Amino acid sequence: MGSVTSELPFRRTPLADAAETGLKIVVVGGFGVGKTTLVRSVSEIRPLNTEEVMTQAGVGVDETHGVAAKTTTTVAFDFGRISLNEHMVLYLFGAPGQERFWFLWDRLFSGTLGAVVLVDTRRMDDSWYAIDRLEHHKTPFVVAVNRFDDDPCQYSLEEIRQALALPEHVPLIDCDARVRTSGKDVLITLVNHLYELAMTRETTS
């Protein structure tokens, strides 16, 4: 799987005057899992990217096992925007994946209502830190498995849930970060999850 998106969203889409609700969503996961690609594929505006070319200085510091062909890395965050309907807008922040930039995550989580954890099953261990930090911040999240063509294992969702020790209430779905409709389905799943959590709190309070 490359990072080229197969469906291009409309660019320079104006924000609807009727938009009432803006939600900050963070996309997290390991290096090379597809965070920048996801933000790029679903954003209705030209996304802000802070990608830089990887240099020799990162050799021995950055873990590139399984993504050796990747030549750029996000050094701050990606930003995009998508309107799910006339009244709800999601502001997307893609977190940097390299371990040396993880200190930025806690700042990105400030004011976040929900998150997407992208998982690459070739590098499953890279997902642990993201899940741990979100649980620490008590930030609701969904897990999206970005399938790669060269993954020899092709684990089932149930196997992935067990490997990550995900509770049953945490949504777990497949996705293709390159495809706009697939990425949008992930975000809709997250919004529905947030709504269900809010309804549960309301009925139990």
Segments predicted by a language model, with ranges:
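Conserved G1/Walker A P-loop phosphate-binding module
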Residues: G2-V67, T71, R81-Y91
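Canonical P-loop GTPase G-domain recognition
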Residues: D149-S205
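A structural signal for isolated positions on well-ordered beta-strands in alpha/beta enzyme cores
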Residues: V26, V142-V143, P171
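Conserved catalytic network of the ASCE P-loop NTPase/AAA+ motor domain
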Residues: A18, T74, S83-N85, D106-G111, ...
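Active-site-adjacent beta->alpha loops and helix N-cap segments on the catalytic face
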Residues: D126-W128
